[in-house]
Each structure stands twice: as structure tokens, then as C-alpha cells.
Amino acid sequence: MVLQKNWQSLIKPEKLEVEPGPVASRIATVVAEPLERGFGMTLGNALRRILLSSLQGAAVTAIQIDGVLHEFSAVPGVREDVTDIVLNVKQLALRMHGEGPKRMILTATGPGEVTAGQIQAGHDIEIMNPDLVICTLDDGVKLGMEFTVNMGKGYVAAAANRPEDAPIGLIPIDAIYSPVRRVSYKIEQTRVGQVTDYDKLLLTVETNGAVTPEDSLALAARILQDQLQLFINFDEPRPVQHEEPQDDLPFNRNLLRKVDELELSVRSANCLKNDNIVYIGDLVQKSEQEMLRTPNFGRKSLNEIKEVLTGMGLSLGMSVPAWPPENIEDLAKRLDETF
């Protein structure tokens, strides 16, 4: 019981609020509250670093241009030199299904701009920014390009993308795999009931469209969870369950007990009484935030109640079907002798 209090006594946000940005699929601010003081900075910094460095994505790793031997060449009839074309290709936002490497083909004839939407990507690759300009062709000029696309994470320099058996004319480029472009966070104060020094975490995430901000945050949280699992060197004690069916009740029969049987402190008992909470079944359906909004009900009272409920196999925020039963007083009297 004492071991569990290390994490069960801490307040946790019940849900995330998502505030969409100008382009909802690319920019959003995710708000989590309330958090224990200091946890906003702890979680915000960790999630930001993971979002920017560790998410898998797709990127072009090399290109070949018909008639071009190296990246310092100029292509006749193309207004941009190869270095500029490479810079434009780096901005391609891709979503790839399955493993790489994959190939994409581009053929175009001038005059006019050549955009990413003209690339033949195949069914395994989606181009998220088809309006991106790759280059500009003069009248009658034909251009042929081939792109190598792969999956990875973070940033990989061009030198690492050159295979040992690279053919003449293959131009490796820097690969920016991360689908997350920018992440910022800030911490604000928030209150729960009478307590005013909790943290509110606001994470603003911008992606390239290959993944939504909400999904990228979920992936980052899962990565963090997986990395921390190794540090847990104990088995969690399981709470004693008291859910033997009796009289075909669809809920734990402890819920029929009255809260004044819990031997709570005078302050806690009075707060429950003033809030018209009579049975444990009434109590467990309250969330932590709802309890803390009760007048004169503080963190100490909350921890006291959570500890008692845990020992009964119960917790705050439960959903109880068919509650309250119509004959609750009769059931409580009939089952009183079993407690």
C-alpha cells in the first residue's frame, strides 16, 4: 500500500484538450492539466526531445538526374542548378507504407514549373506537399529524375546515404526523416478546487502532414514509456478484489456500503456529507478533480479516500452500471451482514 502511494497519490490529467492550428492536420496545441508542480517541465521537455529526434518517417536519400554526373553541375534548360534542386527535394514531405528503399520517377517537359505532384510515387508513397516546386524548365526542355526513398529517424548526412556500389550520377542528399518540424511548450499555473499551484502543460506541435500532431505526441509518449520500463524493478501489488456475485448484482457489493463506515477523518466525512455522498457507489463515480472542487476538501482528504478505496479494489472515476438500484436501501440492509 505504501509503495503504491508513490504514484497513486499524485494528481493526473483526466484527458487531453486539442486546440487545432491554422491547418489542423499539421499544427495543434495539446493541453494537459492538472499536473503536479514541476511535472509540466519534466514531461514537456522529454516529449519535445523525443518528438524532434525519435519518430520514424520517410525521406529522399538520393537522386539521379538524366545527363548529370554530380551535384555541382548545371542542367541545360533548367533555371536552377543541381544544388538548388537538391535543396528543394529536401523539403519533400512523404508518407511511406511499408519498408524501404522505394523508387519514385519524375518526367517533365517545359516550359513551366515542375512540382512534386508530377512525381510518379506509386501506391506505397504519398506526397504530402504536391505543390512544392522542384525546378523550372525552359521551353522544349525534357527532364528525367529518379528518387530513392527510405524510412528512418532523425537526421542522416548525405555521406551516410551513399551506398558502396553507387552508380555514376547518383547524388546522395541529407535525409531529414522526422515528420515533426517544430515543437514548443510552455507551462502555466492552474487550479483544482482550493489548490492553485498545479501545472498546465501546453505543447504546440507542427508536422509535415505525414502524421497528425496528436498522433505524433502519442507515439512520443509510447517511446518514453517503453524506455522507462526497464527502470521499474518491482512487481505492483494487486489490490484485494471483493467482487463475488451476490443476488445477481451487476456491481461490486462494497458499493452498497455507506461512506460513514469507512472510518474517515472528521473533515473528510463532513465534506462527503455536505456533498450528499451517501454510499460508496456514489463516491467512486466522482473524479479526483470533482472531489477537489468540493469546499474544504483538500489533497490530504483525497489521498485518504483513495487509499481506503484501493484496499477495497475500488477507485475514483469508476463507471458503475445500473447505479443506483431502485431498492438500494433494502439491498444495503440485506447485504450488511456480509461485510
From Swiss-Prot:
Region Alpha C-terminal domain (alpha-CTD): start-end pairs: 251-339
Statement: the UniProt record of this protein carries the keyword Phosphoprotein: no
Enzyme class: transferase
Cystine crosslinks: none
Swiss-Prot/TrEMBL keywords: DNA-directed RNA polymerase, Nucleotidyltransferase, Transcription, Transferase
GO biological process, one term: DNA-templated transcription
GO molecular function, one term: protein dimerization activity
Region (Alpha N-terminal domain (alpha-NTD)): 1-235
SUPFAM superfamilies (UniProt xref): C-terminal domain of RNA polymerase alpha subunit (SSF47789), Insert subdomain of RNA polymerase alpha subunit (SSF56553), RBP11-like subunits of RNA polymerase (SSF55257)
Pfam families the UniProt entry points to: RNA_pol_A_bac, RNA_pol_A_CTD, RNA_pol_L
CC annotations in GO: cytoplasm; DNA-directed RNA polymerase complex
Catalytic activity: RNA(n) + a ribonucleoside 5'-triphosphate = RNA(n+1) + diphosphate
Domain notes: The N-terminal domain is essential for RNAP assembly and basal transcription, whereas the C-terminal domain is involved in interaction with transcriptional regulators and with upstream promoter elements.
Family statement: Belongs to the RNA polymerase alpha chain family.
Subunit annotation: Homodimer. The RNAP catalytic core consists of 2 alpha, 1 beta, 1 beta' and 1 omega subunit. When a sigma factor is associated with the core the holoenzyme is formed, which can initiate transcription.
Physiological role: DNA-dependent RNA polymerase catalyzes the transcription of DNA into RNA using the four ribonucleoside triphosphates as substrates.
Protein name (database record): DNA-directed RNA polymerase subunit alpha
Organism of origin: Gluconobacter oxydans (strain 621H) (Gluconobacter suboxydans)
Primary gene name: rpoA
